[in-house]
Design a protein with these regions (language model features):
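N-terminal domain-start signal
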Residues: 3-68, 83
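Conserved aromatic-histidine-acidic binding/catalytic patches
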Residues: 8, 29, 44-48, 73-77, ...
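Domain-length accessory/inserted modules outside core catalytic folds
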Residues: 8-11, 122-126, 136, 184-195
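Conserved binding-pocket/active-site segment within a compact domain
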Residues: 99-169
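Intrinsically disordered or highly flexible coil/loop and linker segments, enriched in small
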Residues: 29-33, 47-54, 68-69, 94-98, ...
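Alpha-helical oligomerization segments
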Residues: 150-197
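Non-catalytic, well-ordered alpha-helical scaffold segments
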Residues: 35, 39, 53, 57, ...
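Aromatic- and glycine-enriched beta-alpha-beta binding-site module
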Residues: 64-112
Length: 197
């Protein structure tokens, strides 16, 4: 299956986007196997990556071969793909519209969510950025994704996976924190002309 990706962009972002787009298209078309796969991914959201062999297989299909781990622990790319896939499954549950929306950053979607609700919800977003472990970040991300699902606000899961790799790395984490902060602020603070009265 990896051979078909040789002529395409083989980045984590494109591979996660491709896999989620396929799942999303099949789910929205009512394909039973896609519903089953999303249910399995949802069940795995709080599990350690690799515990469920089918979910781990789906995760590994989304990780470019050159970025697969070699130790007994998942690496940054594997954790990012696993997190993106399982959170997407939570996000899409019960929705008949796409929750994977290419081009919409996670932080922009979250800014829109907070703008539609209450400013005090920004603390949930801040908790993701200030959490000291990836497990804590995953916990706070799940909370936000649940709220985004409730409000029907989607975002780009391929880009999200790429951002999650950088959020785990101490050398690139400050850059992602700044980028997400800017995206959040721009979405939260600036109302597009078509929304003004």
């Amino acid at each position: 299956m990896r051979m078909q990706h040789q002529d395409k962009d083989d980045s984590l972002q494109s591979r996660v986007s491709e896999q989620i787009y396929k799942l999303q298209s099949q789910y929205l078309a009512g394909v039973p196997s896609a519903r089953g796969a999303l249910a399995e991914l949802r069940k795995a959201v709080d599990e350690e990556p690799g515990i469920n062999p089918h979910v781990w297989f789906m995760t590994m299909e989304a990780v470019p071969e050159r970025w697969t781990g070699t130790s007994d622990k998942p690496n940054y790319s594997e954790l990012a793909a696993f997190t993106a896939l399982t959170l997407y499954a939570v996000h899409q549950r019960g929705k008949n519209t796409p929750m994977h929306v290419p081009g919409i950053p996670f932080a922009k979607a979250t800014g829109q969510l907070v703008r539609q609700r209450t400013a005090s919800m920004k603390r949930r977003f801040d908790a993701v950025l200030t959490a000291t472990t990836f497990d804590a970040q995953r916990y706070h991300l799940r909370s936000l994704v649940g709220l985004l699902s409730t409000d029907g606000i989607g975002f780009d899961y391929g880009r999200f996976a790429n951002d999650l790799v950088h959020l785990q790395r101490t050398d690139s984490r400050p850059g992602i924190q700044r980028e997400w902060g800017r995206q959040f602020y721009q979405s939260y603070a600036f109302t597009p002309k078509n929304e003004s009265k």
